[in-house]
């Protein structure tokens, strides 16, 4: 056939449809000659149309297939199908330059005008075949992975699994294919949540993971961490999901071991019981094991706890680990015996490692508990029992129907040592007094330090003559002066004695305290029995004390707020929060009455804690109303300062309500400045470090020296109302106030005069440069809800 005839034939039969086809199109006649060769075919083979048309098709067949090709064509012409399978056949096409590319092709047999033609449609499949080869290699690689892997179709059916999956779960691909993992691996009797979470993971459209308890083909239950990774095509259509598995059974056991032990620690069981809990949990993880714990005391191992199993284990292998404190010092020994082959060595080592850390925590917890117990029950300076210990001791005696005699001992004149030599030497003086007490202490007597310079002796000798003899012996303890830094300091004791059959602890301590106060008010250096007159007063206090306890627990106390004004500008300096109590039975009870009572019955710290929290809450509420209060001051008892929880209580309240330290001022009395307790001053310094101001209330009523004022981190001093009342009539008082304001200015302290009621008092105080004024002249103490109205209608005051 000539070239023009071929062109005409192609043009008439195939050209309109195939010339622009993106697939290579090749048409051959009954003589196997190429009649049509479109541009796409030119691109695939690298031949020009003119080179191919009219030539035998063999020139387009790869050399290695040419020998068999004529027979294939002949066979097909004689009875082959009209259409060979679509585009599903791959063939390596050999180009003009000898290079080869992968293609997909379909061959169609066409009969026309009694002649048989063949049309081949071919497209480049290089990328597909490369991907197919990559997939094949990937499948081989995945099959050799140590981690189990399955491949899912978009309907979450398993289409592929590797050998590691088969080894872990027991299912080969023929058994797993077409199954959904939540059906194949779920434990029927396990809570539904397990399967629901597995289903949720399977239907994730992004990477995710979770942990499940799954079932193997053999019925074994194993903890698994499963991860899912969706695979998308270029059009963001989901093609497959790859799911990987990790056996975390041992990891879960170790986490459970750690969690169980930590949970037990939170309940603070006794030390030996905690050890048994650790042993039992180790035993539950390690099959056929025996566990022992030893604590080191002075370097020697002391048995702490053991598991319940007997120590005799067949073919036992032993593991031993040193339990160490945080600083690395040895604190104990952990011993584990397991049956040979019961567990892998690596797993036992992991269990031993985490267990020794848990045991170390338990030992530290016990050490901390003992330390806290020591702090709670004993005075850190003297080593004597403290107030808490005393309360427990007296309660125990009363419960046993024993009537003790209580001697409340106040050491007089310690202040002389402080003023002369300082606090450190005063500590030494008190320790010397304690040592002398101990030398005289009898086996059945109990001695404790309840605060500062006050001690309590409890004796079971209740004969009157014996009581007075003991009191005299106590006084004789300090008959000789205490030698401090080669200087003699004469000290005396004021002793209050209480004894009454069937009375409780509060009664005994209150009455002894009243008796001691009576001695001190009369010059000290003596002892005093509690009198009937005192008894009536105590009864009244006990009734009122019960009411006060109820008021505190029922939140019946209230705070009122008295403004403080700058004397020169009339602007607000701050507000003082004052506690008030109105009892349904006793009516209005003044602070001068219920505050000392709260101190006696041990409720003063609860009041102080409430005052701090309520003041901070109210300050935050005003702030939310855009009411600016520069500072709020609160009064705290000296006893509250003896609590090591005070700084934390203040910090917690400030943090809870978002209060800055400079917005809060804590007031202490001048008499508390004279207290000899270094712990108190440490707590004061902590408060100042938090930014909290420190005000000395009732300044001038005590006997504190300037050295004390300088040594404390004071920011403010308050002139007592008793001086303000007399400043207009007594020149000496006025001179004292002038001196106080001058001292305040020199030390950069704010001086506040409280109790100012008249214009004359105000003018006089402003004249001597008292910076801040507080009192009824400006405002009475107001409920919180009245403060905003007062500020908007009065401030700034016209001075």
UniProtKB/Swiss-Prot annotation:
Residues 402-532 form the GGDEF domain. Changing residue 107 to F: Significantly reduces heme-binding affinity; increases auto-oxidation. Its cofactor is heme; Mg(2+). It catalyses: 3',3'-c-di-GMP + H2O = 5'-phosphoguanylyl(3'->5')guanosine + H(+). Keywords: c-di-GMP, Heme, Hydrolase, Iron, Magnesium, Metal-binding, Repeat, Sensory transduction, Transcription, Transcription regulation. The keyword Transcription applies. It is an enzyme of class 3 (hydrolase). Residues 541-795 form the EAL domain. Its EC number is 3.1.4.52. Heme binds at residues 69, 87. One of its GO terms (molecular function) is oxygen sensor activity. Residues 10-81, 134-207 form the PAS domain. Changing residue 69 to A/G: Loss of heme binding. Residues 208-260 form the PAC domain. InterPro entries: Biofilm_reg_signaling, Diguanyl_cyclase/Pdiesterase, EAL_dom, EAL_sf, GGDEF_dom, Nucleotide_cyclase, PAC, PAS. Binds O(2) with a dissociation constant of about 74 uM. Heme-based oxygen sensor protein displaying phosphodiesterase (PDE) activity toward c-di-GMP in response to oxygen availability. Involved in the modulation of intracellular c-di-GMP levels, in association with DosC which catalyzes the biosynthesis of c-di-GMP (diguanylate cyclase activity). Cyclic-di-GMP is a second messenger which controls cell surface-associated traits in bacteria. Has very poor PDE activity on cAMP but is not active with cGMP, bis(p-nitrophenyl) phosphate or p-nitrophenyl phosphate. The EAL domain (residues 532 to 799) is a cyclic dinucleotide di-GMP (c-di-GMP) PDE hydrolyzing c-di-GMP to 5'pGpG; it has no activity on cAMP. This is Oxygen sensor protein DosP. The gene is dosP.
């Amino acid at each position: 056939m000539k070239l023009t005839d071929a062109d005409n034939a192609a043009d008439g039969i195939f050209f309109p449809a195939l010339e622009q086809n993106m697939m290579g199109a090749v048409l051959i006649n009954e003589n196997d000659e190429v009649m049509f060769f479109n541009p796409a075919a030119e691109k695939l083979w690298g031949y020009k149309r003119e080179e191919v048309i009219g030539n035998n098709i063999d020139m387009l067949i790869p050399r290695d297939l040419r020998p068999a090709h004529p027979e294939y064509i002949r066979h097909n012409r004689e009875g082959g199908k009209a259409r060979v399978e679509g585009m599903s056949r791959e063939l390596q096409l050999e180009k003009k330059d000898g290079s080869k590319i992968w293609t997909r092709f379909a061959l169609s047999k066409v009969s026309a005008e009694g002649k048989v033609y063949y049309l081949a449609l071919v497209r480049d499949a290089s990328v597909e075949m490369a991907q197919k080869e990559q997939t094949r290699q990937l499948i081989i690689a995945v099959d050799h992975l140590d981690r189990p892997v399955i491949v899912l179709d978009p309907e979450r059916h398993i289409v592929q699994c590797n050998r590691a999956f088969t080894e872990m779960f027991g299912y080969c691909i023929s058994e797993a294919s077409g199954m959904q993992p939540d059906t194949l691996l779920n434990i029927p009797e396990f809570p539904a949540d397990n399967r629901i979470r597995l289903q949720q993971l399977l239907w994730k459209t992004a990477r995710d993971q979770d942990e499940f308890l799954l079932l193997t083909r053999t019925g074994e239950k194993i903890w698994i961490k499963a991860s899912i990774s969706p695979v998308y095509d270029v059009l963001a259509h989901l093609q497959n999901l790859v799911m990987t598995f990790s056996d975390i059974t041992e990891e879960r056991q170790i986490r459970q071991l750690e969690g169980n032990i930590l949970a037990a620690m939170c309940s603070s069981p006794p030390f030996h019981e905690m050890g048994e809990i650790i042993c039992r949990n180790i035993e539950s993880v390690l099959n056929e094991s025996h566990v022992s714990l030893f604590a080191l005391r002075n370097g020697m191992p002391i048995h702490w706890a053991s598991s319940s199993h007997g120590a005799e284990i067949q073919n036992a292998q032993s593991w031993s680990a040193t339990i160490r404190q945080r600083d690395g010092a040895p604190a104990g020994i952990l011993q584990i015996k397991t049956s040979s082959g019961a567990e892998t060595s690596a797993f036992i080592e992991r269990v031993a490692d985490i267990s020794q850390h848990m045991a170390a925590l338990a030992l530290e917890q016990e050490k901390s508990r003992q330390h806290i117990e020591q702090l709670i029950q004993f005075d850190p300076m003297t080593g004597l029992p403290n107030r808490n210990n005393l309360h427990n001791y007296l309660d125990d005696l009363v419960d046993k129907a024993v009537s003790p005699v209580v001697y409340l001992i106040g050491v007089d004149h310690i202040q002389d040592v402080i003023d002369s030599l300082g606090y450190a030497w005063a500590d030494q003086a008190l320790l010397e007094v304690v040592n002398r007490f101990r030398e005289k202490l009898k086996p059945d007597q109990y001695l404790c330090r309840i605060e500062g310079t006050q001690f309590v002796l409890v004796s079971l000798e209740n004969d009157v003559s014996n009581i007075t003899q003991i009191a005299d012996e106590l006084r004789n303890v300090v008959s000789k002066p205490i030698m401090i830094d080669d200087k003699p300091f004469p000290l005396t004791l004021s002793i209050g004695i209480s004894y009454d059959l069937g009375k409780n602890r509060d009664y005994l301590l209150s009455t002894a305290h009243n008796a001691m106060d009576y001695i001190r008010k009369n010059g000290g250096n003596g002892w005093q029995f509690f009198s009937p007159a005192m008894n009536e007063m105590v009864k009244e206090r006990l009734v009122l004390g019960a009411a006060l306890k109820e008021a505190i627990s029922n939140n019946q106390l209230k705070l009122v707020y008295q403004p403080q004004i700058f004397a020169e500008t009339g602007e607000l300096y701050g507000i003082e929060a004052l506690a008030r109590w109105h009892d349904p039975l006793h009516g209005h009870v003044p602070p001068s009455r219920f505050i000392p009572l709260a101190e006696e019955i041990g409720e003063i710290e609860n009041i102080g804690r409430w005052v701090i929290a309520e003041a901070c809450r109210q300050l935050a509420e005003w702030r939310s109303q855009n009411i600016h209060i520069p500072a709020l001051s609160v009064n705290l008892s000296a006893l509250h300062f003896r609590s090591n929880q005070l700084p934390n209580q203040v910090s917690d309240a400030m943090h809870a309500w978002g209060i800055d330290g400079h917005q809060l001022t804590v007031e202490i009395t001048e008499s508390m400045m004279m207290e000899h307790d270094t712990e108190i001053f440490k707590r004061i310094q902590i408060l100042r470090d938090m930014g909290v101001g420190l005000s000395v209330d009732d300044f001038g009523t005590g006997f504190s020296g300037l050295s004390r004022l300088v040594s404390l981190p004071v920011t403010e001093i308050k002139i007592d109302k008793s001086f303000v009342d007399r400043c207009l009539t007594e020149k000496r008082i006025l001179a004292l106030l002038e001196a106080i304001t001058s001292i305040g200015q020199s030390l950069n302290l704010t001086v506040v005069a409280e109790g100012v009621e008249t214009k004359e008092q105000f003018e006089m105080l402003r004249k001597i440069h008292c910076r801040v004024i507080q009192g009824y002249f400006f405002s009475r103490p107001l409920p919180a809800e009245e403060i905003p109205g007062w500020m908007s209608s009065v401030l700034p005051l016209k001075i």
